[in-house]
Amino acid sequence: MTQTDSYLLALYDISGIQEYIFATNRMKENVGASRIVGDLMRSQLIKVLKEHESIKVDWQKDMEIELFSNSEFQAEVVFIGGGNALVIYRDHNLCQKVFKEISIKLIEKSYTLTLIAETLEFSYDKTTSYYPLYQELQDTLARKKEEMVRPKPFGALPISAQEHFGGFPITYKDNRSTIQALKEQATESIELEDIIDPPPKKRWAVQINDLKKSPGDDSYIAVIHIDGNGMGEQMKRKLQNLDKNGLSFAEQVKGHRELSLQISQGYKDLVQNVMKTISFEKDILPIRPLIMDGDDLTFLCQADWALPLVVEILKRMESYSGDLSLSACAGIAYVHGHFPFDIAYEIAEVCCKEAKKKRSQNGGQGSYIDFQLVRGSDVSARDVTGRPTNPNNAVLGRYRPYRVSEHEKNGVNTLIECIKQLNEKGTESEMRIPRTKQKLMYQAYLKGTEDAIKAANELLESRGIGDFNETKPWLDAFELADYYEQNLFKSRVVQQ
């Protein structure tokens, strides 16, 4: 094809990721779905592009864009990350072919995920600016995602059997549907990688029992959702500055590549480094990362690991130094192992939004954590958003969401200190306040009456715990007393 000054900027996005991963309570399928999603943009798109000649795909190692200066290239990947892929095409027909081929791959590999793409034609010369084109393309794709109705595969016919969870027709002899089989095959595949590598000589959990403190019982696990604070706005400001400073199209693309890599690799390296500091004897860590999408992280873990693990991750983020500041808010849903994962994820996501809301109300600085302990089965995200917000919350000892700060009054450190005090041992290695007493005190705080709270505080004070001249988050501490491992990063934790 002869060289032309007309190009296509194409932005790809996969829709329905969370629904796809958490569509079942079979953890093996959740793991497989996570691997499939991670592989689609990272590997399958690259494979499709490599099937065509003269396409530059190695954007991470060579930051300089070559499409405009080398007429042999027909397309070039700008970046892949955050669930998106951006490609510039010289050949418009090639753009259509790639979209068709990757869409087919998506159906073959996942069965139900949807690929959304938007293109923008532009003419290139030395005065062309990259950022306005990219921003226009992003806005167009966002509108398209809001308006589109995602197609769904055919369900079971009246004459066909169907699997009980998603209602898809059974297509395998062992009573599995196609989507179930694809996910399980992905779990066992040696070709597909985990979204985050486990620490050396360790493996991530694959079965739900791997996450339980006592395998076989109905103990709690945690679903954790962490989302970066204002990363999109930071990226937007950086790209705007590149444009305002008069940098060329190629220089702006290089800057975008560097920032994208810094976000995705920065978060990934940080989380991996935290995981390496965990002290645990067994080969299988009771953790399973499921989503790593730019600054968006979702994972499952043993319930008592959740709070210390999240606090450590958020603290590491705040101490990160780079062109972009890394900070985040987190939501934790504590649920029984049999609790529906899709609802648990929704609760964790809403908790994260509540944490972000409090961060915004307090000046938009720092990292915050919110959590919900689900005791029954009839619980939804409305139970998080519908919490009372009256001034009595402080009296009741509930300060959620908590700021992750060494100096914040009634921040997460205060909550952790209260939990540690409740878990202190007495002279004969017994609890200073037995769990039975703690449950009674917890009920007193829930009642919210002054007499009940006064009696509970007097009992705490009589055991030498706490100074009750000022209120502390005792209600939240009572809830999490059984779900906090204080030696996760200090001493060896040995489970029988």
Residue spans of the language-model regions?
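Regulatory and interdomain segments flanking nucleotide-handling catalytic cores
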Residues: M1-Q496
